[in-house]
Amino acid sequence: FDAFIGYHHTLQSTAQKGLCMISGNEELIVKNHPCGIVAKDGRAKLISANDKSNFTYRGRFIEPQQALTVGHETSQKAHNALAWIIANQSIMIGGRTFVCWNPKGDTSLFKDSETLTPNYSDEEEKKDFPATPTDYKADLKKALSGWQDKLPAEDDIVIASFDAATTGRLSITYYNELKGSDFLNRLAFWKEHCYWSSGKFGYQSPSIWEIVKCAFGTEQNGKLSVDDRVMREQAQRLLHSVIDQAPIPQDI
């Protein structure tokens, strides 16, 4: 790898360089950036410039580089890191990709956060489930204590969602950065105030897609189903309620 990197730098040594607006360094500036960050949207790009027709930005910029310049090395590092995170730690809700990660390397935070309080299935052996709200909150407190041991309070947490409105453009539809302590406190606040009786499985906090199904779903063959377009938009609204402690939308 080191030999290839050295060879690549040699090829770039004679190329014209400019200021990378992300790293702040002088780098070889690239116009074309990687696609396929989200596998299902294989042709969609996060960074692209195409103004050969309709002239959306003419009169503001003459060249794409006047709006943004990104270095080749920075672009490769950022896109490949993001592609790995999405491939390994994302969940898909209604066709939209949601991902949560710790820049220090803790894995699968988003998936685990959905089970901060255990959810039980019919296949599991019969056990003692939280039979009352008091039992439920006691279980939640134990789970939160375990999470606090895993995730230092000062660690950073990043939550984002991605969706492609067209085949060529990938959008960041939600983005938030917060400390580990805030992240856990907000999850705990949501689960402490938003729970219901699950019959023989006791009291549990429903997932955001379960809430969307109950609010907007139509019954088909004994099951609730929701159009993907409705699911992804409403799930993101509820994610805002969970992570940002915003009020639950009145229509839900």
Description of each model-found segment:
Residues F1-Y7, E27-I252:
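Extended alpha-helical scaffolding segments
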Residues Q12-G18:
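Short metal-coordination and nucleic-acid-contact micro-motifs, chiefly zinc-binding Cys/His arrays
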Residues S23:
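Short Cys/His-rich metal-coordination motifs, predominantly Zn2+-binding knuckles/fingers
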